[in-house]
Amino acid sequence: MSAVRFEGVTKRFGQTLALDEVSFTVEPGEVVVLLGLSGSGKSTLLRHVDGLHGASAGRVIALGTDVGQARGARLRELRRRISFVFQQFHLVDSLSVLENVCTGALGRLRGLRLGLVTYPRAVRLEALEHLERVGLASQAFQRADTLSGGQQQRVAVARALMQRPEILLADEPVASLDPESSAQVMGLIREIASERNLTVLCSLHQVELALSWADRIVGLRSGQVVLDKAAGDLDHQQAVAMIYRAGPLRAIA
């Protein structure tokens, strides 16, 4: 069973066509990068996977669930199995790094409230393990706002892992980072995906990063899929030509 399947997904916002009959699948454990310019539909498509957006036509199947038909407890259970890492880190500056990571457990454990003192020891230890994995265990008790941008995004990745997801969605996770930090964060996501058989669907606009870290690249332009290929079968020039250059839309597989 595919981890995610898009079947003719179309999305309109008023008169604006954001997605135009998008169809492709993401297999379990696969790292797929959505590549395209701002406004190409990448973020909109990601938000269909956990039901933040609903399709105007077509459907999305995630972890065996028809997302558009999921309601109540069924939708909550689906979202528990999916984590999201955003371009903006969304850390709580006044909390410690460890406390921020612990908040990732709020969605799966009942009776927890924001604040370190309410977290069971097992939750704190798990959070420390994730911080160790992202190389920030020594900063666990610092305030989150004392970290660099790259470090804060690594905290966001650790927080996402606290949810114990089966799918990780990442929306331009390195857009605000310098090249070195970008490579570190993408490398970390790639390594964790391999270790945990974690399915990753990530949006980027940097071609070289996508080619370096993805199993497969799906290119979007004007809401349409114009490219769907294994990253190893593409070079920089091909990707740029298909995704970023003007001209008639023509999908290649």
Swiss-Prot record:
Look up keyword Zinc-finger and say if it applies. no
Query: What residues does the ABC transporter domain cover?
Result: 4-247
EC number(s) on file: 7.3.2.2
Q: Does the keyword Protein biosynthesis apply?
A: no
Can you supply one Gene Ontology CC term for this chain's record?
plasma membrane
User: Which top-level enzyme class is recorded in the Swiss-Prot or TrEMBL entry?
Assistant: translocase
Identify the CDD domains for this entry: ABC_PhnC_transporter
**Main subcellular location:** membrane
Q: Assembly and partners? A: The complex is composed of two ATP-binding proteins (PhnC), two transmembrane proteins (PhnE) and a solute-binding protein (PhnD).
Q: What is this protein called?
A: Phosphonates import ATP-binding protein PhnC
Q: Which organism is it from?
A: Frankia casuarinae (strain DSM 45818 / CECT 9043 / HFP020203 / CcI3)
Q: Which gene encodes it?
A: phnC
